[in-house]
Amino acid sequence: MKRTKIICTMGPNTNDRALMKALVENGMDIARFNFSHGDYEEQKMRLELLKSVREELDIPVAALLDTKGPEIRTGILKDGKKVILKEGETYILTTEDIVGDDHKGHITYEGLAQDVAAGNRILIDDGLIELEVKTVKGKEIICRIVNGGELGERKGVNVPNVKVKLPALTEKDKQDIQFGIEQGFDFIAASFVRTAAAIYEIKDILAANGSNMAVIAKIENAEGIENLDDIIEASDGIMVARGDMGVEIPAQEVPFIQKRIINKCNEACKPVITATQMLDSMIRNPRPTRAEVTDVANAVYDGTDAVMLSGETAMGKYPVEALSMMASIVEETEKHLDYRAYRQRKVSAVNEHNVSNAVCYSSVSTAHDLEAKVIVAPSITGFTTRLLSKWRPESLIIGLSPSSSALRQMQLYWGVKPYHAKRAESTDVLIYSSMELLKSKGVIKENDTVVVTAGVVSPVKKHEPAIHTNIMRVVTVD
């Protein structure tokens, strides 16, 4: 059974219930809804399909809302026709609302003329076209064409190493987040996060609406990397979004940055997702390239909690095959992980929760020494399972909770298999009911060794949530 989680992007393919069901049956842990495309009616239809399938299969697949985020794009062109930009010639970008031609084109971000200066690079269409700023005059940015090509309408624009003053959240993002709250999404992936302030702004919106959605920060540019530590602290997880990152910074630097982000998230006990073009060729072909297989495996070796499929499942020709291939790569790679090294590393886990950290570490070590079948972690919020997962035990972590939302959020944690369980009134009842549930599910059997770890409160405060993970017990299954 795979331990690294897989996120699949929804799209035209998943308008079909049979395909949605096949994705869930073949290992999709989280469904990603990309709000850069589609309207609310379309997104709601897919979400209802997901809810229907997860209820039928009794699998708590989570739903992630990926915001469009603040972005810069080119404008419309005369007659809708592409224009040819030739190397060495001049092209003008303007914030004035015009119909572009082969001499001048509109740019959607009104503040760009104030943010750039002579010598700055402007990249268009994933970096296929490169312009160098020569001078700025009012609303016009006069550029030299460094790399030419065909310029189409509404193409993405990146400005490497320039701190643009775009808002952290657009009005569309705020409306989409409100929609996500109403529809019961489990995660928000915030695009183009540059500072921790963006995360706090989203969390304020969630708190005002009584939502416990987890916020994932997408790191996509140099400013986000520069403020990485603060963003990790503010967020509930990180996505290494390598698409725009590979345009904003030199592509050859992305592998090191990926490893650095994953390592920092592991140390901070925050889940991390590796995304973009992982099995990209399977959009068109039934098998991946060797380089893509290696890319997925290396992300697992690096310590990622989850890997993500984008166009492969959203609109590719082989969505289920891509998912199955990713699952098989992950499972094979996990056979060769150095689990001993994970136990020896020091997780800086969550400051005030050092009691929890010590108990979880002891639970993982004990499970290893006794070759325990599973580590069982009853938890209201899922905190214990998140902490356990960072120690990467060989034993499967079973997360038990009465909270459906907590179970779905556990789907992002490495090595955690969530099951719904009732809240128990005492430790003995908790352990007994947990063993009975897992026997009925076929997870454990008679004479198996099980390590149970949980946060338990004193009888005086039995109606309050536990502050720490504070007990560990070894159980031989009757």
Task: Place the predicted regions along the sequence by residue.
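Non-catalytic helical/linker scaffolds that mediate oligomerization, partner binding
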Residues: M1-D478
